[in-house]
Amino acid sequence: MRTTIFRSSLTAFVCTALFALATPAMAATVNMKADLKATSEVPPTDSKGTGSVTATFDTASKKLSWKGTVSGLSGPATAAHFHAGEAGKNGGVAVPIAGADKGSFEGSATLTDAQAEELMSGKWYVNVHTAANKGGEVRGQVTK
């Protein structure tokens, strides 16, 4: 009788363990943000502008969704982008951001595997450009 109970318990444990190992990793929604400042630009600007971006990243679909605002810029934003690059380094445009010229903006994009890896590794930043600061007026590293 004890042997039967032990075998049944062991079988149940092994089946549960195998099921857990066979189940694919669960997708997660990661909350992210970027605080936009002139001092974060490379090189820094003397702008009084500021801004913020909040974002969510779905690790299964690789969809990045964002909302942001900018204010106090030297003039209207002429462009805004997510760039690939570590803090203190400039990098290429990864995803354009529409609507920053209005002061507030939102959007979404589906990332490639390489882009998703860079984003999750802290190697992306948001940059807002103006006519007076063509290379970028305010910038913020995207963090979790």
Regions inferred by a protein language model and the residue ranges of each:
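Metal-centered catalytic cores of metalloenzymes
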Residues: R2-A17, A22-A80, A84-K144
